[in-house]
Regions:
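Binding-site signature for planar aromatic cofactors or substrates
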Residues: 1-179
């Protein structure tokens, strides 16, 4: 059933780019575990052991806080249509804000998205596939545009203020890369 790999194969990459949704999990030794759903056109495979994703403004910034302290990250992709499969990428990651060298190196890989907050760069150390037999089937309808519409209405200064007031501390009180 399950198999482990030391890199993202071409077959894995094909599966990943067809998914409309993925999940990001992070934690530190003494924090709550955070799992966040991600969508939109926000993930890129750079090479067999490196992926990046564009982190948009959200109600919290747990991922950035956890990465500052620990760096461990898991990404999970599930097949909600077609053949069942679950694919996990395990590794370490770092968060990079606007105007950083990593941001500048990667932001051009994504379409313009209002509220773009960080580029997350993940070094993939292990890939694991499992059967996905228990994952339900869903019909994909489309991406929601509420987040990008909200960010567009807030404008650049409004988003920056939101980052300072709402995204500078984790739910555990730890600083983020905006703190």
């Amino acid at each position: 059933m399950g198999k482990e790999y030391d890199r993202i194969t071409d077959k894995h990459a094909d599966f990943i780019i067809r998914q409309q949704l993925f999940f990001v999990a992070t934690a530190t030794a003494d924090s709550r575990i955070n799992v966040s759903p991600k969508g939109l056109d926000s993930l890129r495979i750079i090479d067999p052991n490196r992926v990046i994703w564009l982190n948009l403004t959200g109600s919290g910034n747990e991922t950035a806080s956890h990465l500052l302290k620990d760096g461990r990250m898991t990404l999970m992709f599930c097949a909600f249509e077609g053949e069942p499969k679950v694919l996990r990428l395990y590794g370490h990651a770092s968060s990079h804000q606007q105007d950083s060298e990593e941001w500048e190196a990667h932001i051009g890989r994504f379409p313009r998205m209002p509220g773009a907050r960080q580029v997350i760069v993940m070094q993939v150390e292990q890939v694991a596939s499992s059967c996905g037999f228990g994952v339900p089937l869903f019909d994909y309808v489309g991406q929601r545009d509420m987040l990008t519409d909200w960010a567009e209405k807030k404008g650049g200064k409004g988003i920056e203020e939101y980052w300072r007031t709402r995204n500078s501390r984790s739910i555990d009180g730890e600083p983020t890369d905006f703190g």
